[in-house]
């Protein structure tokens, strides 16, 4: 399933009267407001993919935008980004054939670990920075980076992390200024909530939020009332609460401060962040913080709340059932793959189906983290230098 550049949409959108003549649908991985994602085996090769099935009636009036954005996604090729492999069209459906992920979700892996350190978090963030830097060089802004969109490539202990879900991604330039309020509450940058024009810096803010969560297990901004939550984000005031941050290095906190900087012009870029000692040096500590972080993840990101349309563990379950286990990683054909098109709103195209933040009822994209704020505070940061 080669992806080539310079093609018209008609040449890369393959016609299929009956998709099931090409793929054998194995199992439903998830459903959303506009689509269904299924585990599918390509009959000609035996390769496994995740196929997102979108009824054309859901696309009505949005065809042009969707085609433009799919064309953008087809240009992306990076080892830490889930790939769009192919596109089929039938009289009634559009089918997006995605790389299939088999390693499960980020939070699951952290909770299941017996040992987890700052160094582990630093390694994760380094991979995210590398992938997002690639996107930014391509002129693409993801706009919905969050832990739920970070998946493991395989079951392997040293598996790389993959960025998924480009439902809200957007190309910079071409004369248009990004100003649509979209993303997931709790991870969006202040300038997005302020409805100001914004840039790729919004992704860097989100990476800072993710790094924060990876080091303590709860989000930097929390309130059961969305308006108050947005107020906190707009002010960029967050805390390094005791006792949760007592064993975290000053270098890690400095790294987060530079990404969660209120002023996007002063905020670290991906390139700057990748050069920070916490990423590029030896300042990330090797002390085991698993007990504290995993306990907070269990408390604040309950599976039933933060898992949305795509259930990555269904892939693992199905593979085990088919006894594909060890052959997956060694096979050059079948499943060296990964997926997730599951965004909170199951968005289909960046410019057409952005979820307006003001209408969201969830907190931080996980339904609601019902975490009481710790009463002892070791440090408060205003998000502005």
Swiss-Prot record:
The active site is at 144 (proton acceptor). It is an enzyme of class 2 (transferase). It catalyses: L-seryl-[protein] + ATP = O-phospho-L-seryl-[protein] + ADP + H(+); L-threonyl-[protein] + ATP = O-phospho-L-threonyl-[protein] + ADP + H(+). Residues 375-385 have a biased composition (Polar residues). It holds the Pfam family Pkinase. One of its GO terms (biological process) is regulation of granulocyte chemotaxis. Residues 23-279 form the Protein kinase domain. Activated by Ca(2+)/calmodulin. Binding of calmodulin results in conformational change that relieves intrasteric autoinhibition and allows phosphorylation of Thr-180 within the activation loop by CaMKK1 or CaMKK2. Phosphorylation of Thr-180 results in several fold increase in total activity. Unlike CaMK4, may be unable to exhibit autonomous activity after Ca(2+)/calmodulin activation. Induction: Expression increases upon treatment of EC cells with DMSO and retinoic acid. Induced by KCL in PC12 cells. ATP binds at residues 29-37, 52. A motif (Nuclear export signal) lies at residues 318-324. The keyword Ribosomal protein does not apply. Residues 360-385 are annotated as: Disordered. One of its GO terms (molecular function) is calcium/calmodulin-dependent protein kinase activity. It comes from the Eukaryota. The autoinhibitory domain overlaps with the calmodulin binding region and interacts in the inactive folded state with the catalytic domain as a pseudosubstrate. Belongs to the protein kinase superfamily. CAMK Ser/Thr protein kinase family. CaMK subfamily. This is Calcium/calmodulin-dependent protein kinase type 1D. It comes from Homo sapiens (Human). The gene is CAMK1D.
